[in-house]
């Protein structure tokens, strides 16, 4: 997994949320959480697995909404942040954090109602292997995001310290078919790449986000977006 050693560092884990989701990054955080809630709802009493849960941004949020949730990450440093976040939110009793490799999940087949992974597939060395594993442990739904190959993201992706795998729609559909999944729904967002939002204060990012949203909702929005959200179902 790209970045595996990087994310094991405690100082990296401690600064992760602030570096990405403060300033203009809060618009990214808000949109990602909206996408997850929309895809997985209703979550009450649902058995959910989050793969690559990181600092527990989504894990704690879904537990607060009534989900019975397990968060998996390969980094113990990230899991420590997740446990801390869960305690602060008062939902630690509803979450189980497990250190494990997303390609070898320690759960039986069809163990969860829904499985999701955010900010995961751009780092996956073998996307097909990981997709098959997510499908294996899900009894119904797999939700995930990808960065689009033909988008503004491609302009700077090469310069990122760990690189960033980009996907065309055809590649994602092939991944789904290969894993035994059927696409139920897809959404696309962020013509302006994430990197911009992280670098500017909120008062600058706000107007850009409004313009960004208008572009994405236009007739050419799907083609210009840099992020895609994929909602798939396990094939019968």
Predicted feature residues:
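Class I SAM-dependent methyltransferase SAM/SAH-binding core
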Residues: 55-104
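A conserved beta-strand element that flanks and buttresses the S-adenosyl-L-methionine
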Residues: 116
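A short glycine-rich, Lys/Arg-flanked "PGG" loop and its adjoining helix->strand segment in the class I
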Residues: 128-141
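A C-terminal cap/extension of S-adenosyl-L-methionine-dependent methyltransferases
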Residues: 185-236
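Conserved class I S-adenosyl-L-methionine
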Residues: 1-43, 45-54, 197, 206-212
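Short, glycine-/aromatic-enriched active-site segment of Class I SAM-dependent methyltransferases
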Residues: 144-163
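Short alpha-helix
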Residues: 163-180, 186
């Amino acid at each position: 997994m790209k970045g595996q050693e990087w994310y094991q560092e405690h100082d990296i884990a401690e600064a992760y949320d602030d570096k990405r989701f403060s300033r203009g990054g809060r618009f990214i955080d808000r949109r990602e959480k909206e996408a997850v809630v929309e895809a997985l709802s209703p979550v009450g009493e649902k058995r959910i697995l989050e793969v690559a849960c990181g600092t527990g941004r989504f894990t704690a949020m879904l537990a607060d909404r009534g989900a019975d949730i397990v968060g998996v990450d390969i980094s113990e440093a990230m899991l420590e942040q997740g446990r801390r976040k869960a305690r602060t939110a008062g939902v630690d009793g509803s979450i189980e954090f497990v250190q494990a490799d997303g390609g070898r999940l320690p759960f039986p087949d069809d163990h969860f109602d829904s499985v999701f992974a955010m900010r995961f597939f751009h780092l996956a060395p073998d996307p097909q292997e990981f997709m098959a594993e997510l499908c294996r442990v899900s009894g119904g739904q797999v939700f995930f995001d990808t960065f689009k190959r033909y988008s503004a993201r491609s302009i700077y992706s090469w310069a990122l310290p760990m690189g960033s795998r980009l996907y065309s729609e055809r590649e994602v559909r092939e991944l789904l078919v290969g894993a035994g999944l059927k696409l139920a729904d897809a959404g696309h967002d962020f013509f302006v790449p994430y990197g911009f939002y992280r670098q500017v204060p909120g008062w600058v990012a706000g107007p850009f986000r409004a313009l960004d949203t208008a572009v994405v909702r236009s007739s050419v929005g799907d083609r210009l977006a840099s992020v895609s959200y994929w909602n798939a179902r396990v094939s019968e």
